[in-house]
Regions:
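Bacterial N-terminal signal peptides that target proteins for export
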Residues: 1-7
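Bacterial N-terminal signal peptides
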Residues: 8-16
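N-terminal activation segment of mature serine protease catalytic domains
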Residues: 21-82, 88-93, 101, 124, ...
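PDZ/PDZ-like groove recognition
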Residues: 25, 186, 190, 237-302, ...
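C-terminal cap/linker of serine protease catalytic domains
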Residues: 26-55, 152, 156, 203, ...
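Active-site region of chymotrypsin-like
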Residues: 61-63, 70, 125-136, 162-219, ...
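Conserved active-site neighborhood of the chymotrypsin/trypsin-like protease fold
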Residues: 66-77, 82-162, 190-193, 258, ...
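A structural signal for short beta-strand/turn segments enriched in small hydrophobics and glycine
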Residues: 87, 147-153, 205, 274, ...
């Protein structure tokens, strides 16, 4: 091999090595830049979320209050929030349901409050003070999905007003084999004693639920949808009481779907609104009021929103015929029983069966 050829070969190898090193350095630099940009993006996202939470808290906190009361065992305290400008507020039944001598801490002062309504089936209560107040806007829990971010504001333990941030973990109709009276939202949201009755807010600052119980060592909690409380408030405005409706049907799983529904009428109780309307065992239930039915469990939500005395359209499939009956609902037999409805074959549960009360029990003062 000539010296010129050897020199040229060595030069090419050296140049290739230098080029490879430059490319490697460039690749490393690009990767470092990409990692930095991703970290910066995450930091900016976290900052944006933090600002959003602060904004929700700043706008909503002035309408959230601490509630004191006394029941037959001890003093209690929990959280509530105003829903109109005339001093009406929502809280959890465990706070405002069975206690009395209520005092509300609002705007740096204490005000006496009275109970308007306590409904054990929904797990909610309404109190009122005679003052002009701010009010939280009402949202729609139906717009929430699993992993939707949410904020609660409450008074944990004996601490000041505190925001909590988490997300929707699920929509449950039962807990430990026993059914709720309506679907509850399970939240990856830490909750302590004293936070029962706290508003659950979407990122617009609208109320979408009320915190009612805690789970898993306070790392998660349940909230009842705001629509359930609004249903009870609507009853109160019309009748002065909660009026849970009932039509008198039992449903079970059909062998095969009919028009998309597996809910088959298995029993029509005698002398009930359903029996008088002409509904029969064997009919496949498609819709109750505005609620579509596809599974037997759908009847829980559908029936919860029925008001006694109202005429409710009930649509069924009977053979090849789609029929709609007008059924006038009567008062639900369980209107004054437990918050949790028992599953078939299990004993009934009352509100004390909720995993953990979130109210704070305080030893009575001498």
């Amino acid at each position: 091999m000539s010296r010129k050829v050897a020199f040229a070969l060595i030069f090419c190898l050296s140049a290739g090595s230098v080029f490879a090193q430059e490319q490697s350095a460039k690749t490393t630099s690009e990767k470092t830049k990409e990692m930095f940009e991703r970290a910066l993006s995450r930091a900016e996202s976290a900052t944006a979320v933090s600002h959003q939470i602060k904004d929700v808290f700043a706008r909503a906190a002035k309408a959230v209050v601490k509630i004191h009361g006394v029941d037959e065992h001890s003093e209690i305290c929990g959280t509530g929030f105003f829903i109109d400008p005339t001093g009406t507020l929502y809280t959890a039944y465990t706070v405002g349901g069975e206690a009395g001598n209520f005092t509300i801490e609002f705007n740096g002062k204490k005000y006496p409050a009275r109970q308007l309504l306590a409904d054990i089936r929904s797990g909610t209560a309404m109190l009122k003070i005679d003052e002009a107040t701010p009010a939280l806007p009402i949202g729609k829990s139906e717009q929430l999905e699993v992993a939707t971010p949410v904020v609660s504001i409450g008074f944990p333990l004996d601490l000041p007003e505190t925001p909590n941030f988490g997300m929707v973990a699920g929509f449950d109709r039962k807990y430990l084999g026993r059914y709720f009276s309506t679907t509850h939202m399970r939240l990856n949201l830490p909750s302590q004693r004293g936070e029962a009755g706290a508003p659950l807010l979407n990122m617009k600052g609208e109320v979408v639920g009320i915190v009612v119980s805690s789970l898993e060592n306070n790392a998660a909690c349940y909230a009842v949808p705001i629509e359930a409380a609004e249903k009870i408030r609507g009853d109160f405005m019309r009748f002065g009481e909660a009026r849970h409706g009932w039509v008198g049907i039992n449903v079970s799983m059909a062998r095969q779907p009919v028009e998309g529904s597996l809910a088959e009428m298995t029993q029509i109780m005698e002398d009930t609104p359903a029996a008088r309307s002409g509904i029969k065992a064997g009919d496949i239930l498609l819709q109750v009021g505005r609620k579509k039915v596809t599974q037997p469990e759908d009847v829980l939500d559908a029936s919860f929103f029925i008001t006694a005395g109202d005429v409710v359209p009930v649509t069924v499939m009977r053979g090849n015929q789609k029929l709609t009956f007008s059924v006038q609902a009567t008062m639900h037999p369980a209107s004054r029983t437990g918050l949790l409805l028992a599953a078939p074959g299990t004993p009934a549960m009352n509100q004390q069966a909720i995993p953990l009360s979130l109210r704070s029990d305080v030893p009575p003062t001498p």
